């Protein structure tokens, strides 16, 4: 790649790193083409970009972004997974792939909210429920008091109606 191409790639990756909610680095040594394609397809479904970029170019691209915390990890074969939406979904796919493959695909590090995170932190992130599940749980928690209040309000007239009905049945029986 010539100097112009490298400059263009650095600019493109810099823009992506600035927009990203989270970035994960992995050592892809030992992956064959089939495994790489499978991983890319799974990551694409989770709206995650997966690229292999030279470490020196990654280091240049990360300058001026909150992803500079990853600079110490730019060593050896490095693949970068960039997510603009849900960091949990990306962590789930990467962690699952690292567990299921027989090759030594390993997570190196990541950055979330401008802070570097370890492979153990990435695994902890992967163990969280998905964003949709967390939102549903939160909405359920917020809705529960209102639902209970409506139930109590509905119970009072219902009890009154049942009492009147019992009195009516009692009087009809006499």
From Swiss-Prot:
Statement: the UniProt record of this protein carries the keyword Ribosomal protein: yes
Any GO CC annotation of this UniProt entry: large ribosomal subunit
This entry's Gene Ontology molecular function terms read:
large ribosomal subunit rRNA binding; structural constituent of ribosome
Instruction: Tell me the SUPFAM superfamilies matching this sequence.
Output: Ribosomal protein L10-like
Q: Does the keyword Signal apply?
A: no
GO annotations under biological process?
A: translation
Signal peptide positions are none
Q: In its UniProt entry, what is this protein called? A: Large ribosomal subunit protein uL10
Q: Which organism is it from?
A: Geotalea daltonii (strain DSM 22248 / JCM 15807 / FRC-32)
